[in-house]
């Protein structure tokens, strides 16, 4: 009976154990599946379960028993007084209740007291301040901030003479040896454009961060990651745009941008390697520098230095997609500066300054105080007084509880704050034996404290994941310090930060008792952190996910100089808009741009705005550019008068070609003018050839064409006769009024031939009252003047007329191509598909896209309908030759169309169709895409009306143009819009 019962119990235990193992296996598989998706659990059992005894921290239990015992001995036994015992007991109970509310209270109190009562913690506060505010030896400079309590600072003065001779053996470019005998190296990293990158790609990129910390499982390494958000001022108000309206509009825009809050977000990873773990003695002392020991000691240090550099290079390789840059020394005007020291100095009070690091002098030329004179601490805020007597306020944020799981987007809202901050994450990996001991210790404490089966299962899962090498564990702490120029701004920033963190599942508040700890902890420090707990390597990688913007354009030293203008990115950082590919000033760089946006998306406003901004390129040319080429010409091929007001306000010539009305175009007069200039022989011949081909096209208008577009019935003799007559007319010294009429008069013998040259040209001749006499048979002054800075041509009237559109477009684009002579040239073609529908225009544009770069010209093609542009004969050329693509909102777009023409990803297409409201998606070959705003709120409304002309105002603008008594057309336009009731 007893045996049967025992077997039944064992069988039951076996079933339970199998069920537990099954559940644990399922749990592990679920965790692994989540981790594959970038979702990593917090093992909160490590936060408090392993450090508590009967529900309280064991150090608190032992300390309370000791204090109570001493009180009883002193009060009751010696003095027969019971009140002190009661008071101590009440204090212990109150503290215990505090633990019930916040299990970290004891640790926070202990660490905070190091700053509040330094006499109880010898030297801690003084050392912490001294490390920042005193002069330190150059290459040991920063890590006193680090203050490990298990070490003594024994770089004694007795060794100074040896240091003076041999300290250089500890130095290397980008590596600092501290007086705590640790090596420090810092890498600056670029962000990932998380807004425009697909989730799958983000997970793959983030996996490289996971791999870094799985490769470091020894406690001799520590990592300090800083996210630094620094306010910057965008001041472009001193730029000259050359034209009155351009200057007025861009001044209003630039002043608005100057008032905006722009921030620069930077990421830094500092690696520390502890050398003491590799030496036989706990600290180095003078005998290391004795003659018989120094060479061996030097050899060990050099070996460790090489190993440290190898590890940093490994990290750079693993994080190569984040564009790592080592902070090293650099030379300017013969003086050596240290980027690395500048960064550590910056962490004090967010003051940027060059940092001299002269290798011939062991002591810094400037103090390691970051430009800070004094620091004051209050309850929830602090104030920094800088050397220049400027003030900055700060506050620390304490995170009490963490969300159940971590993901790479955990701190996205923090990065988007309208505030300056330094966010430091500290991580110290544990080795495998320490991990095993930690897990066993935690398991025992869970049993003692009556922990749940769920905690036990969680611990089992953790052990399995660690054992398989999926994750590692390490000690972690953080310090988030906000900065502001005013107290009110500081309070607002704290409110926004706390709200953002709480919305992500954290429990955060402004630090009070521990604020000093957090302030000093941001300098690569564990010892001053109020709370340190264990997290997985994946958790830490999620904390430091570099989600910002890796491509911000280029502010200056572009092909034509400065950036076109500055826009604001989604994370409030500046985006320097350029059309050219990144290059150096004066270099020939492709700048052709495709602009796509539906009706109402702001396409015309954007094009007009940037056209005004490009007025600045009429100045500042490279020295190798000849004087006659130091000029800028901008041509805008318009549709439906959208740019009419803008061209007029800029002081440009707006050519309206209307059916039946003399165009003012005289190709013969233009070609004859070229013959009289100092143009090259090739340019002169080209001008004649253009007119020959144009007149031949007129003569063969009604002919049946072959597959190459050549007339079947036009004889070679007629072609030669026509060409000779055109050449004679252009090169002869004669009046070129009505040149088509003069040609017909020259062909008098053909009047009776229905297929002769006279009959062919008669429709374009005034003397014969031809149907199209208004096209080119005009006075001897051609209307197109490309010596002007800005010219607009509207094709609304003729583009849909197949009888005349091919001839007008041919002449216009031939003239434009001729004007691309090495000067800076911008050609804008709005609703490009309408112009490119003509095969000859398509040929011209295709040639421009392929060769204009060498002639210092850029072409910008814009359209509302991507489908129509795909139907153009040069769609493939557009895709290949336009490295810059700018997208505005298009709710009705088709993914396959965008992919065919612009290589758009699914994520980018989602943004185009849903996420662009007065914003652009900028995509340039070889660079990540960027979302940037061209928000024009606050700009005078009359300026905005000028940028994009509504059709209802076309006649009013016509009146202004036709009224010759109005000299300043721009001011007339401005007054017209100001008088409208809407304003």
From Swiss-Prot:
Alphabetical UniProt keywords: ATP-binding, Cell inner membrane, Cell membrane, Membrane, Nucleotide-binding, Translocase, Virulence
Domain of life: Bacteria
Database matches in CDD domains: TrwB_TraG_TraD_VirD4 (cd01127)
Catalysed reactions, semicolon-separated: ATP + H2O + cellular proteinSide 1 = ADP + phosphate + cellular proteinSide 2
One GO CC term, this protein: plasma membrane
Binding site for ATP: 597-604
Quaternary organization: Component of the Cag type IV secretion system, which is composed of a wheel-shaped outer membrane complex (OMC) and an inner membrane complex (IMC). Interacts with CagV and CagBeta.
Function: ATPase component of the type IV secretion system Cag (Cag-T4SS). Acts as a molecular motor to provide the energy that is required for the export of proteins. Required for CagA translocation and induction of IL-8 in host gastric epithelial cells. Plays a key role in Cag-T4SS pilus biogenesis, especially in the localization and stabilization of the pilus-associated components CagI, CagL and the surface protein CagH. Is also critical for assembly of the entire cytoplasmic portion of the Cag inner membrane complex (IMC).
Protein name: Type IV secretion system protein CagE
Organism ancestry: Bacteria, Pseudomonadati, Campylobacterota, Epsilonproteobacteria, Campylobacterales
């Amino acid at each position: 009976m007893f045996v049967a019962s025992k077997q039944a119990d064992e069988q039951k235990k076996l079933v339970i154990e199998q069920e537990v193992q099954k559940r644990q296996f399922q749990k592990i598989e679920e965790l692994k599946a989540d981790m594959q998706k970038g979702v990593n659990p917090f093992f909160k059992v490590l936060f408090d379960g392993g450090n508590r005894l009967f529900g309280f921290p064991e150090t608190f239990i032992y300390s309370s028993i000791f204090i109570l015992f001493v009180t009883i001995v002193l009060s009751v036994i010696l003095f027969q007084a019971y009140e002190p015992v009661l008071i101590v007991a009440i204090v212990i109970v109150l503290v215990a209740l505090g633990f019930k509310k916040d299990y970290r209270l004891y640790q926070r109190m202990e660490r905070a007291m190091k700053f509040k009562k330094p006499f109880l913690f010898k030297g801690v506060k003084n050392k912490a301040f001294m490390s920042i505010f005193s002069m330190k030896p150059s290459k040991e400079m920063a890590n006193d901030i680090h203050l490990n309590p298990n070490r003594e600072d024994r770089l004694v003065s007795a060794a100074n003479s040896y240091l003076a001779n041999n300290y250089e053996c500890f130095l290397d470019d980008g590596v600092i040896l501290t007086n705590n005998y640790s090596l420090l190296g810092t890498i600056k990293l670029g962000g990932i454009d998380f807004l425009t990158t697909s989730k799958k790609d983000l997970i793959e990129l983030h996996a490289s961060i996971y791999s870094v910390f799985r490769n470091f499982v020894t406690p001799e390494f520590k990592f300090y990651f800083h996210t630094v958000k620094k306010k910057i001022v965008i001041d472009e108000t001193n730029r000259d745009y050359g034209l009155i309206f351009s200057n007025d509009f861009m001044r209003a825009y630039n002043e608005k941008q100057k008032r905006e809050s722009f921030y620069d977000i930077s990421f830094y990873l500092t690696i520390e390697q502890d050398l003491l773990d590799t030496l036989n003695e706990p600290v180095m002392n003078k005998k290391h520098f004795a003659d018989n020991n120094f060479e061996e000691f030097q050899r060990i240090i050099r070996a460790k230095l090489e190993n440290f550099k190898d590890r940093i290079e490994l990290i750079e390789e693993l994080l190569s997609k984040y564009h790592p840059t080592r902070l090293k020394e650099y030379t300017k005007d013969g003086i050596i500066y240290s980027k690395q020291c500048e960064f550590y100095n910056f962490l004090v009070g967010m003051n940027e300054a060059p940092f001299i690091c002269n290798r011939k002098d062991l002591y810094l030329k400037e103090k390691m105080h970051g430009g800070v004179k004094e620091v004051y601490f209050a309850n929830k805020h602090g104030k920094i007084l800088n050397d220049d007597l400027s003030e900055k306020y700060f506050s620390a944020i304490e995170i009490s509880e963490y969300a159940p799981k971590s993901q790479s987007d955990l701190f996205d809202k923090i990065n988007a704050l309208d505030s300056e901050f330094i966010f430091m994450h500290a991580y110290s990996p544990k080795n495998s034996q320490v991990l095993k001991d930690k897990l066993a210790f935690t398991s025992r404490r869970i049993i003692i404290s009556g922990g749940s089966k769920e905690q036990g299962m969680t611990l089992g899962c953790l052990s399995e994941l660690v054992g398989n090498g999926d994750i590692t564990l390490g000690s972690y702490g953080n310090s988030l310090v906000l900065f502001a120029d005013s107290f009110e701004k500081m309070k607002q920033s704290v409110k926004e930060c706390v709200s953002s963190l709480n919305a992500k599942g954290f429990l955060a508040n402004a630090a009070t008792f521990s604020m000093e700890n957090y302030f000093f902890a941001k300098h690569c420090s564990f010892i001053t952190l109020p709370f340190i707990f264990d997290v997985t390597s994946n958790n830490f990688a999620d904390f430091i996910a570099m989600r910002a913007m890796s491509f911000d354009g280029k502010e200056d030293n572009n092909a034509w100089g400065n950036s076109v203008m500055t826009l604001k990115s989604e994370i409030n950082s500046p985006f320097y808009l350029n059309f050219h590919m990144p290059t150096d000033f004066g270099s020939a760089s492709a700048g052709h741009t495709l602009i796509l946006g539906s009706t109402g998306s702001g396409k015309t406003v954007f094009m007009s705005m940037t056209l005004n901004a490009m007025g600045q390129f009429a100045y500042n040319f490279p020295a190798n550019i000849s004087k006659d080429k130091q000029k800028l010409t901008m041509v805008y091929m318009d549709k439906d008068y959208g740019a009419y007001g803008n061209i007029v306000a800029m002081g440009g010539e707006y050519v309206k070609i209307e059916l039946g009305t003399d165009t003012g175009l005289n190709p013969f007069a233009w070609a004859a003018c070229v013959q009289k200039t100092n143009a090259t022989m090739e340019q002169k011949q080209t001008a004649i050839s253009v007119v020959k081909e144009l007149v031949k096209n007129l003569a063969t208008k009604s002919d049946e064409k072959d597959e190459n577009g050549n007339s079947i019935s036009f004889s070679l003799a007629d072609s030669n006769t026509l060409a000779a007559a055109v050449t004679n007319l252009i090169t002869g010294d004669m009046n070129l009024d009505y040149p088509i009429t003069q040609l017909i008069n020259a062909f008098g013998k053909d009047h009776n031939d229905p297929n002769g040259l006279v009959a062919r040209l008669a429709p374009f001749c005034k003397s014969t009252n031809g149907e199209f006499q208004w096209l080119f048979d005009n006075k001897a002054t051609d209307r197109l003047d490309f010596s002007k800075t800005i010219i607009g041509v509207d094709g609304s009237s003729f583009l849909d007329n197949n009888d005349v559109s091919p001839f007008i477009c041919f002449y216009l684009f031939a003239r434009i191509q001729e004007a691309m002579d090495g000067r800076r040239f911008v050609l804008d073609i709005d609703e490009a598909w309408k112009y490119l529908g003509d095969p000859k225009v398509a040929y011209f544009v295709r040639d421009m896209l392929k060769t204009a770069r060498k002639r210092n010209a850029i072409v910008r093609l814009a359209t509302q309908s991507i489908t129509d542009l795909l139907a153009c004969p040069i769609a493939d050329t557009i895709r290949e030759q336009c490295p810059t693509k700018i997208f505005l909102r298009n709710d009705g777009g088709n993914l396959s169309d965008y992919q065919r023409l612009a290589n758009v990803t699914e994520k980018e297409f989602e943004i185009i169709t849903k996420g662009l409201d007065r914003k652009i998606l900028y995509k340039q070959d070889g660079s990540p895409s960027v979302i940037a705003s061209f928000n024009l709120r606050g700009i005078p409304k009359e300026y905005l009306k000028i940028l994009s002309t509504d059709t209802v105002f076309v006649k009013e603008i016509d009146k202004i143009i036709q009224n010759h008594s109005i000299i300043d057309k721009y001011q007339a336009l401005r007054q017209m819009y100001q008088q409208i009731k809407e304003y």
